[in-house]
């Protein structure tokens, strides 16, 4: 939800509107921009069923996630966004093996495919795939649950968006304070 009454947010949006309208490509970022002395604070993966389409198998996203982890950046994922974490595989295994997360539960997706975002049935179940790779889902409902495990910040559903934003901001500010 865009806070239309917040002048600071509206100014920030206007300042970055050109970037929002013409974002850079993930491929270009993965090839040219990733450095150890980055000014980036985090990788953000938004939610929605779209995070299940193309991103989990995207080699460039995998490179970005592995780079972010290696350089000490946080990764933030909301709702179905953790599906994209599946791209973080390397010769050493799955990057998030052993992590605990909040994510939109398969049980809810299985009850509501007729109102989902995808045309047709779900192609696969997010929690099921992540669990098979060693990730533990700690929420059972599509609620406002949020969680931090190491440098991974997750939120369970759209209902978690406000708490997720607060937790992400607090977590990133702690990192900034520690680096000052």
Region locations from a protein language model:
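Extended, subdomain-level signal for the structured scaffold at the beginning of enzyme domains
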Residues: 1-71, 75, 83-180
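Catalytic nucleophile serine of serine hydrolases
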Residues: 79
